[in-house]
From Swiss-Prot:
Keywords: Cytoplasm, Ribosome biogenesis. It is found in: Cytoplasm. It comes from Treponema pallidum (strain Nichols). This is Ribosome maturation factor RimP. HAMAP family: RimP. InterPro entries: Ribosome_maturation_RimP, RimP_C, RimP_N, RimP_N_sf. It holds the Pfam family RimP_N. The lineage of its organism: Bacteria, Pseudomonadati, Spirochaetota, Spirochaetia, Spirochaetales. Required for maturation of 30S ribosomal subunits. Gene3D superfamilies: RimP-like superfamily, N-terminal (3.30.300.70). GO terms for cellular component: cytoplasm.
Length: 156
């Protein structure tokens, strides 16, 4: 698993706006389509995955939607943006840089050997992560991992 922080200008610009609402932007997929004959203008389509330690509710998604649409319109130079905002759920972690966002959450990691471990994410940096399983911390270098996935606890 590689560690490569997302440094694209559009991602950073949107992440800053999302942080102002107390959330983290985990992933942003963004595209601008060609000019449509019907509407005679280009349109943007985006999907944002956000995280908040207190949970991502419908209200949080709506607030992020309202604040992100104008930013995406400006970045894409389009008047119309179709934006979908959602929580990470049981997200497969695609990049080791995402681990720092999910500190304190339960994750399942798979090793190159085919074995796996479930634990609470206690620490993450550029080279390794630390899971706490049964009160015992285990440090795991990213090079030993093939896959990782969130296992969110059910919140009442």
């Amino acid at each position: 698993m590689n560690f490569s922080p997302n440094t694209l200008g559009s991602f950073e610009s949107c992440a800053e706006v999302v942080r102002s609402l107390g959330c983290a932007l985990v992933d942003l997929q963004w595209s601008v389509s060609a000019v449509s004959r019907r509407v005679q203008q280009a349109q943007g389509r985006a999907r944002a995955v956000i995280y908040s330690a207190g949970g991502v509710t419908l209200d949080v998604c709506a607030r992020v939607h309202r604040i992100l649409v104008p930013r995406l319109q400006a970045l894409g130079g389009v008047r119309t943006v179709f934006l979908e905002v959602g929580s990470p759920g049981e997200r497969v972690i695609r990049n080791a840089a995402e681990f720092s966002i999910f500190l304190g959450e339960t994750v399942k990691v798979w090793f190159c050997t085919g074995q796996f471990q479930v634990g609470t994410l206690a620490f993450a940096d550029e080279t390794c992560l630390t899971l706490t399983a049964g009160g015992v911390p285990v440090t795991i270098p990213y090079v030993q991992l093939t896959k990782a996935q969130l296992h969110p606890a059910v919140r009442a």
